[in-house]
Amino acid sequence: MKRAVVVFSGGQDSTTCLVQALQQYDEVHCVTFDYGQRHRAEIDVARELALKLGARARKVLDVTLLNELAVSSLTRDSIPVPDYEPEADGIPNTFVPGRNILFLTLAAIYAYQVKAEAVITGVCETDFSGYPDCRDEFVKALNHAVSLGMAKDIRFETPLMWIDKAETWALADYYGKLDLVRNETLTCYNGIKGDGCGHCAACNLRANGLNHYLADKPTVMAAMKQKTGLR
């Protein structure tokens, strides 16, 4: 039996990854992280979506220690979420240092326990938000270290790594879940479901990608299929 663990926030990217994983694996487990995030409404959204879509298990892990260590506008109410990013040094204040290091490592431990062969994450370098822990070289390096440390070949999969936001919408549409992803996910840094606040960088990226896709569906769908190998 093929099993996978999806790092699942209930946002556009991870929901699209979950939709695809459910088509490719016999058993899919979701793991969601509570790190005291500003937009912690995503935890309830993730629970609801994982249940609705049919994930085998829906685990929420308490990693609020990260909140104490990582200072970010997503972990501190006193730091405002900016409308546009990145900042002058290239790293936006929404970056949570160490977040994906922790999430992927814990997801791999969970995968080890449930005998899953893959950990799936929705990080992406094409519409790169300036987060160093979304880069392909980082994911590959951590994957190698984790596999060595557990003496087990757990594969980190990044199905969105080389497609842009418009193509991510196309991928959701390919699986017949465009409306679900648009209306029922939570991507907004300010914790607003669906189309979100319309001002933060996450909402900007999401809306621009959707508008691009809706304006030229055939071209974007063809590009997505070419990059992902789907037919």
Curated annotation (Swiss-Prot):
Keyword Nucleotide-binding listed: yes
Cofactor needs: Zn(2+)
Binding residues annotated for Zn(2+), in chain numbering: C188, C197, C200, C203
InterPro entries (alphabetical): QueC, Rossmann-like_a/b/a_fold
Function: Catalyzes the ATP-dependent conversion of 7-carboxy-7-deazaguanine (CDG) to 7-cyano-7-deazaguanine (preQ(0)).
Protein name: 7-cyano-7-deazaguanine synthase
Record has Metal-binding as a keyword: yes
Family under the similarity heading: Belongs to the QueC family.
Alphabetical UniProt keywords: ATP-binding, Ligase, Metal-binding, Nucleotide-binding, Queuosine biosynthesis, Zinc
Organism, scientific name: Escherichia coli (strain 55989 / EAEC)
Domain of life assignment: Bacteria
UniProt binding sites for ATP: F8, S9, G10, G11, Q12, D13, S14, T15, T16, C17, L18
Reactions mediated catalytically: 7-carboxy-7-deazaguanine + NH4(+) + ATP = 7-cyano-7-deazaguanine + ADP + phosphate + H2O + H(+)
GO molecular-function terms, A-Z: ATP binding; ligase activity, forming carbon-nitrogen bonds; zinc ion binding
Associated pathway: Purine metabolism; 7-cyano-7-deazaguanine biosynthesis
Cofactor binding note of this UniProt entry: Binds 1 zinc ion per subunit.
